[in-house]
Amino acid sequence: MRKAKILATLGPASREPAVLESLLAAGANAVRINMSHGTQEEHTENIARARAAAARLKRPLSVLVDLSGPKIRTGVLKGGQPVQLESNAVFTLTTRSVAGDAREVSTNYAGLARDVRPGARILLDDGAIELTVESATETDVVTRVVNGGTLSERKGINLPGASLPIPSLTDKDRRDLQWAVREGADYIALSFVRRAEDCLEAKSLIKAAGGKQPLVAKIEKAEAIDHLEAIVEAADGLMVARGDLGVETSVELVPVYQKRIIEEANKKEKVVITATQMLQSMISEPRPTRAEASDVANAVWDGTDAVMLSAETASGKYPVLSVATMARIIDSAEAGRPASAQDGIAHQAGRKSGRVSRALCEAAAFAAEEIDARTIAVVTASGLMARRLSSLRPEQRIVALTPDRNVQNELSLVWGIETHLHAPCDNTEEMLKMCERTLVEAGIAQQKETVVLMAGRLSGLGLSSSVTLYTVGGPLPRKL
């Protein structure tokens, strides 16, 4: 079973029901709703279609809603057609409402002219185009094109090294967050996080809206790297957002930061997603480059929970093939993990947390190793015990059994966890029989096979943070 998960961004290329079903069948475990594009109404339909496709395939699905954040973007272009910016040409960014061309384009950031100085660098489209500021008026920033290229509509604008007086949560983000809670999203991602306080504010808004969604902090600013440990503590998960991170810092530092972010997330038992340009060439080509295949494999070896596809599945020519290709690369990477990569339990050993649940997870993982068990089954109401076990990266199959469909969907994004839904049980004996029946019917365990069985805190069932070795078809243990 593939352990690292695949998060696919939905868009025009992948929103049709037949394509969505093929996307999930090819290996997507979760879908991303990018609030930078489209309307709430369109995304409501996208979520409904994704849930329906998952239901037809009888599998869980995580839905991650990615808030736009205070992204500075270029505006529209004449006729919606891309323009070519030539090196050494003069190009103007303006707050005036204009249909852009090769001489000027509008921006959604009213404070741009105020916040730049002559000589400052401005990067467009994830750094593909570089400008240098020559002068500014109240509305216009006049620049010289250093590195030209093709500019399409609504592309990102980055000001490397600049600290802009912009809140992490915009008014649009607040509306979209409330919408995401109403739609039953499984995760909410916050863009352009700079400090832990940004995460705490977003989490308070989720709670106020009546939600319990885990918050994923997107690490894409230099300030976020400076405050990484505090952000990891405050957030429920992290995303290595390499596009903006590479232009806000420098491209050669992205691999260094990626490893550091993943390591910090693993240490704190937080889900972590590696994103941006993983199979970029498959937007237009049916095969990835060798470098892209190596990139995906290295993210897996670094310890990421999930790898993400962006334009590859949202607007590319080969959305389903991109997912299938990524799944094959992950399979190969996991089968051929080098000795230098993290080594499961040994990698996490010795990190004392003081938590009983952590100790039980380590005990279960070591017990499974000692008796050569193939499966660790986790009975969980909240998903917490399963997530903690996952953070140890055991070799064994992790099977989470939960009565809560929301928990089942949430765990679909977490490394190595296979989830099964079950009806609520009234007592310990009924729960044990349910576990055995589920494992056998799913083809996970056979008669007389010994599995490691864990239970989180399930009030009223006599199961409380426990571990037992259980032989399928054998006598039920009297007490866990």
Regions found by a protein language model. Name each.
Residues M1-L480:
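Non-catalytic helical/linker scaffolds that mediate oligomerization, partner binding
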